[in-house]
């Protein structure tokens, strides 16, 4: 079997619509377009969002906010999430492999939410004051 020989199963597809081939076909003369009007003409379709000259909805509503380019590059991590990692030396690569942060993230900050009971060594990861105190209390280290 090759990609260029694959075909749909028999009866799975409909025959193409043959328009303008006589009265008996059911789609003769006007070809299913009705009589007159913009939609009956060739090339007679307006652009998406066009409301016949009325000010379109997307222009009536005010512009609002913007899409931050940095939001996908930054991530927060709880102390309790560090507990679930089996490795003791933790850096950004380890967090990505554990699935705790997205692959697009380049900056991580550990926040003091939850509890930690095992000593971990953080490398290249920022921490808040509360998180730093909690990590160092259980014998952990933080390197930048």
UniProtKB/Swiss-Prot annotation:
Biased composition, class Gly residues, residue ranges: 21-31
Pfam families: Ribosomal_L27A
A GO CC term attached to the entry: cytosolic large ribosomal subunit
Location of the region described as Disordered in the Swiss-Prot/TrEMBL record: 20-49
GO process terms (BP): translation
Record's keyword annotation contains GTP-binding: no
Keyword RNA-binding set for record: yes
Disulfide bond sites: none
Protein function: Binds to the 23S rRNA.
Subunit structure as annotated in this protein's UniProt entry: Part of the 50S ribosomal subunit.
Protein name: Large ribosomal subunit protein uL15
Native species: Neisseria gonorrhoeae (strain ATCC 700825 / FA 1090)
